[in-house]
Every structure is written in structure tokens, then in C-alpha cells.
Amino acid sequence: GSVYAERLVFDGEGDAVEAMNQTMQELQASVLSAARTDSMNLDTEMSIDTAESDGSEEETLPQEADAAQPVYSMALTIDGDDAITYLDDHYVCVRADGYEYTGGAHGTPFRQYFVFDRETGARLSLSDVVENPVEELQTKVGAAFRELAEKTNFAFESPEDLEHTVADGISYESPFYLSETGVVFYYAPYEIASYAEGFPEVTIPYSELEMRIELSK
């Protein structure tokens, strides 16, 4: 098996840059740790490669793999400019894409977003970004996914049932990211739709939200 994990490195100096780089380093370390644990559970050996965002090799730990062992691989990539979903003088949002394969027809993609305050280096949660009560967010996001389902019929459930499922699950801990036009809420494959649908998402425009932070765009 094998694991490959990239790490985005922010340029510059100061405590804020150091804090953001520390968060990204912790992400890389968590992926490597999870891969080691999974490979031990599968009783397979693996090679490990880690790289910074410029593609330079940072560490390589090759091991011999037995062809009879279970197939395992994990990758974490941060795709340069395409990984930046929002950027202004004060805030940045970064996407990290991952993929884990443990056998079968296909693996499991995963995705994380990191919203940073560039002045402090702090990673922001949804409650740091918006003031809306959870109940309002549940209504807005549920209705948006229902509208998407009515247009594309992408979900496991009917649009009406999907609206209730989404609304019941939305909280300040829900996965989200910042785009140029609004706050985006998303689900992983298989959560509300088939693997082929990827990461279903809806955008709630900034104009419809009570923002705690002032964005430049």
C-alpha cells in the first residue's frame, strides 16, 4: 500500500503565518497517522511520501510490499491556486482533497476546508463566520438542497424528505466553505446521494446571511 500527503505552506513571516502553517502541518500529520493505523488494521505494509505545496519531496519511507497483502492507498492533495476558494486581504479559504482506497470497486474521497483569519492565523468555524441562529441556517440550507433536488433529482430521498434530513442535520459544526458569492454547505459521497454525485453542495449568498466577518468581495 501507499500514502501520499501534501502540505500547503503559506509564505511570509509572523505569528499568523506560523499558526496557519501549523494547522496545515497538523492536517498532513493526521492523514499519515490515520493511514498507518488503517494499514496496520489491514495487515499491509506501505510506502509514505510527503510533499510541500511546491511539490518538493520532504520524506520518503519505502517498505517492501507483499503482493498477497490487501491493497491500500491514501492520498491528500492541495491543488495550488485551485485549492483557494476565497481570498481577500483578511481571510482565505483552502480546500484539501483526499482519497482512501481499501479495495473494491472504488475508494472513498474526502474533503476538508480551512477558513483562516489572515491577521491572527486562527481557523474559523461556522459560528465565527455567521450570526444567524442555527434554526435559520437549517431552514435556508434545507430549502436550498430541496430546490437542487427538484432540479436534478440527485438525492437518495425525495426533495421533500431531503429538505427535512438536511435541516435536521445542519449545525454550527456542519462542513462549509467560503466562495466568491456565499457560504457553501456540502456533503460527502454517500451521505445524501450516490458516489457518482460527488460532493453535493449549495451556496447561501452572503446577502442572505448575517455575517460576523467583513469580506471584501
Name these PLM-found stretches.
Residues 1-217:
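Compositionally biased intrinsically disordered regions enriched in Thr/Gly
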